Amino acid sequence: MKNVLKFIAFATLTFTVAVAQAQGKKKPNIIFILADDLGYGNVHSFNPNSKIPTPNLDKLTEEGIKFTRFYSGNTVCAPSRCALMTGYTMGHAWVRGNAKAKDGLAALRAQDTTLAERLKGNGYKTGMFGKWGLGDEDSKGAPHLKGFDSFYGYLDQSHAHDYYTNRLYEIVGGKTVEVPVDTTKYTEDLIVNKAVDFINANKDQPFFLYLPLTVPHAELKVPAELLKKFQHADGSSKFPPETPFEKKGNYDSQAQPHAAFAAMVNKLDTDVGTIVALIKKLGLDNDTYIFFTSDNGPHKEGGADPVFFNSSGEFRGVKRDLYEGGIRVPLIVRAPGKIAAGQVNPTPWAFWDVLPTLGELSGTATPKNIDGLSFSPLLSGKKAVKDHEYFYWQFNEDGLKEALTKGDWKLIRFKNKGTAEKLELYNLKADIGEKNNIAAKNPDTVKALYALMKQAKTPSENPRFDWSEIEK
């Protein structure tokens, strides 16, 4: 009897210690790196024919999992980031398009709870460094009101075109304020340095680092020493023929746009390497998930040449298109000890799934009413508990565009005010380049997908993105 009591006491103690250890277990750090206008084909591990070396991203791919059918929230900046932060598709999101700076309707509302707010509520230190795009300093969408303890960077996409600006924004004293910047400094360097400081300052506690870098978005401008990597000794470009870009709108002139774009992608790759090296140096490798993706497809502004660089890979379209090239983006996730290296996964998922996925990884509660689903099981080689029936996007510049995918089928709708709609149907398995519109040959499929397209959206509550007039 005495031995039985000893065994029970030992077992009870062991269980108590195990529970205490589980309860006290450190939540994983999460680093989410978001490139700006980087095409699927600009990452060498996603496109072996890429002209630009990306050794750090390739290494990240080797050490983690590569998703080959991951979708952005939209085909331009602000709405894509809205989907990422809130978990809503373009059929339900508050921000469904880009807008000018200081436009209050382009900012998140108080009730639009973000990923950062949820993680902060679960004990995470939260930092963002780069381009926000979802609210100015005096709006309800300012970074300090959307869950970030630290922020340094740009508030709107127009300002973010300037890589040698005289001002950025920072959270100081609990508020987002303008801070002066030395115009001889390349802002990408300043932003990455702040991210490094944030990691060092929070290495002993769970942190969420959101790093929405601004490269390789136009304008095509880099420091001379970075440009030299893609120039011959005589100063000529390693990527001829070059067509000089003359200043237009917000974008400054660039004599060698090919070399400059390559240098910007290389800079992005180097910055990713800096973050990964720091995590290793601090011994945080086994406690940290690193995500890398892009906000939409490649741009063609400011002298950029996505055709020359095969920036969309095998896909049709670029930024502002709802063809695959405008919305299919690279996704790499690395977490040694948690994610087996060298995986390739073709499961489709999207920006609005990031919030619930990170929620499950971190033990953070996820709201029931959002569009996103958790795909965290994919990271450990398992199947998702639930898949989406379909994926939906809408975008309005030069008329309304909508797209919906279901399995291998994809329907795209074009509509301008006063004109009849145009429908295009593609089978992505048979025609990944979306070259052959087979809508006329498949009326039943068109009808079924069209019905889902109506089901996937509600009229926008935001008058800035109310496109009901276009439907007339």
Predicted features, each with a name:
Residues K2-A9, A20-E424, L428-K472:
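Formylglycine-dependent sulfatase
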Residues A11-F15:
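Repetitive helical segments and hydrophobic/amphipathic motifs
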